[in-house]
């Protein structure tokens, strides 16, 4: 009875996780740094009068917030890094990405201590080495590693790609792979790398869509910069030509003109979010929403120039 249950247990799905604490701490440190300075810049921008320096403070706050989000994603990816061995595949889990390696495509496993140290191009900080390198005797290799020294690396060479993993118990890891390889695969699998969750949106792989969203954001920044730079020179009470009211002349507080910039920001946010969602179902419609957002920014820039010149 015992001899019959041992093979079954040995072929259960096994998740091997490398040491991740250092990588998460370093990545989290960048998140905290960017978030703190973003909050400080936002506080300056929110409490200051409308002028170009206020625009710069707001821009810095937004950029630092984006940096914090990016590093938070990378820190989460380090925390979630795992090598999952099931019946037919070895799956590398890295954040919102999974790399599936059929076990029957694995040709050999090479301990890192037997090879020269590689210089990884990609994400590189203490406890995080994710990217690619040309490794002597192995070739082009994808790294999903948190290693502190080459001794912690295990190179998995397949018929298509080579991978560098951080495995402390390399003998045990190799035994698990070899046990499954000896039995042969039950179901056919294709070696692939796939995004999951929010990273699976087609938007992230569409350079045209990313470019359209980026240009819209840049035009929105130009709109804010012009409005905030021109605002201090206006008198407190001005003639308002925006919005147009069929030739009716209005007078009011100059703060009314700030609504042009706020409208541009709202249009950018709405069109970008809806564009990304729609793009997942219909690429052309999603692209049109992002492009139209940029066109509306141009219309608002022209409206702002005319409104300020007439005020």
Locations of regions flagged by a protein language model:
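N-terminal membrane-targeting/pre-transmembrane regions
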Residues: 1-56, 144-147, 151-180, 184-206
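Non-transmembrane, membrane-adjacent beta-strand/coil modules in membrane-associated proteins
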Residues: 2-16, 93-162
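Alpha-helical transmembrane spans
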Residues: 14-80, 197-230, 256-309
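Conserved beta-hairpin
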Residues: 68-115, 242, 247
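Juxtamembrane/interfacial segments flanking transmembrane helices
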Residues: 80-87, 170, 233-238
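Alpha-helical membrane-embedding segments
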Residues: 87-96, 117-128, 265-279
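Short capping micro-motif at the N-terminus of alpha-helices
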Residues: 101, 165-166, 250-252
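Active-site and channel-lining beta-strand-loop segments
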Residues: 230-257
């Amino acid at each position: 009875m015992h001899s019959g249950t041992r093979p079954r247990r040995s072929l259960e799905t096994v998740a091997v996780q490398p040491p991740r604490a250092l990588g998460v701490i370093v990545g989290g440190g960048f998140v905290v740094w960017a978030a703190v300075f973003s909050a400080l810049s936002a506080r300056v921008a929110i409490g200051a009068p409308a002028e170009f320096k206020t625009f710069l403070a707001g821009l810095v706050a937004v950029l630092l917030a984006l940096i914090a989000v990016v590093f938070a994603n990378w820190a989460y990816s380090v925390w979630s890094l795992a090598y999952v061995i099931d019946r037919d595949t070895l799956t590398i889990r890295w954040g919102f990405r999974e790399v599936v390696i059929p076990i029957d495509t694995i040709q050999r496993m090479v301990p890192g201590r037997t090879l020269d140290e590689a210089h990884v191009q990609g994400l590189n900080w203490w406890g995080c080495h994710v990217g690619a390198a040309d490794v002597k005797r192995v070739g082009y290799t994808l790294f999903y590693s948190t290693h502190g020294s080459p001794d912690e690396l295990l190179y998995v060479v397949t018929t298509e790609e080579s991978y560098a993993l951080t495995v402390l118990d390399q003998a045990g890891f190799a035994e698990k792979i070899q046990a499954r390889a000896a039995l042969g695969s039950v179901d056919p699998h294709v070696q692939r790398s796939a995004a999951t969750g929010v990273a699976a949106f087609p938007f992230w792989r569409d350079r045209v869509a990313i470019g359209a969203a980026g240009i819209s954001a840049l035009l929105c920044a130009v709109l804010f910069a012009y409005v905030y730079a021109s605002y201090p020179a206006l008198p407190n009470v001005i003639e308002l030509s925006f919005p147009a009211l069929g030739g009716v002349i209005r007078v009011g507080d100059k703060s009314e003109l700030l609504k042009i910039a706020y409208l541009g920001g709202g249009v950018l946010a709405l069109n970008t979010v809806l564009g990304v969602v729609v793009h997942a179902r219909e690429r052309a419609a999603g692209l049109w929403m992002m492009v139209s957002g940029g066109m509306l920014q141009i219309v608002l820039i022209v409206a702002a120039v005319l409104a300020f010149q007439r005020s």
